[in-house]
Amino acid sequence: MAPSRNGMILKPHFHKDWQRRVDTWFNQPARKIRRRKARQAKARRIAPRPASGPIRPIVRCPTVRYHTKVRAGRGFSLEELRVAGIHKKVARTIGISVDPRRRNKSTESLQANVQRLKEYRSKLILFPRKPSAPKKGDSSAEELKLATQLTGPVMRIRNVYKKEKARVITEEEKNFKAFASLRMARANARLFGIRAKRAKEAAEQDVEKKK
């Protein structure tokens, strides 16, 4: 079996001229400097906008292994923007990332991101396109003087863990079967449509029998 991914190479019996095929990594320090210079150049180019780019939504990581954690997503959904009262075309011009493919599967995620958008909108300093003729929604001259470029991520997302105090385990919790409950919940979700169809057919047959 061939070695897979980044694991240890077991019993390496080298026959070919392997010294010539060793992968080197001498460009790593220079690459680090190049990335840093590119970040600084971009920050200067987009100033006074935030250096890290537009604001991102709070999303939950996929799969059972990671879904207890939240992280930054790609862009806000169209529904979130609609509830927050921001037009999708205007959003991109004021530093809000938009992802039209994303769907909100829960009310909690929708509310959290709408709140995030409203908070961002309240903190935002909008420069007028024409300084001589500011429009409605643009920031005042005093606010513009206070504006500085944000270097870190816009409204950093943090995982908050709530600590629970120690208590006595109840009898109900002792008798609870977690694995069986999960299997049953999955089975009920999977068979929901089939059972509904069978119930409907049974009801129709009963009506026909009564006739």
UniProtKB/Swiss-Prot annotation:
There is a cross-link at K123, K145, K174, K177 (Glycyl lysine isopeptide (Lys-Gly) (interchain with G-Cter in SUMO2)). The keyword Acetylation applies. GO terms for cellular component: cytosol; cytosolic large ribosomal subunit. Its main location: cytoplasm. The modification Phosphoserine is found at S52, S77, S106. Belongs to the eukaryotic ribosomal protein eL13 family. Component of the ribosome, a large ribonucleoprotein complex responsible for the synthesis of proteins in the cell. The small ribosomal subunit (SSU) binds messenger RNAs (mRNAs) and translates the encoded message by selecting cognate aminoacyl-transfer RNA (tRNA) molecules. The large subunit (LSU) contains the ribosomal catalytic site termed the peptidyl transferase center (PTC), which catalyzes the formation of peptide bonds, thereby polymerizing the amino acids delivered by tRNAs into a polypeptide chain. This is Large ribosomal subunit protein eL13. The gene is RPL13.
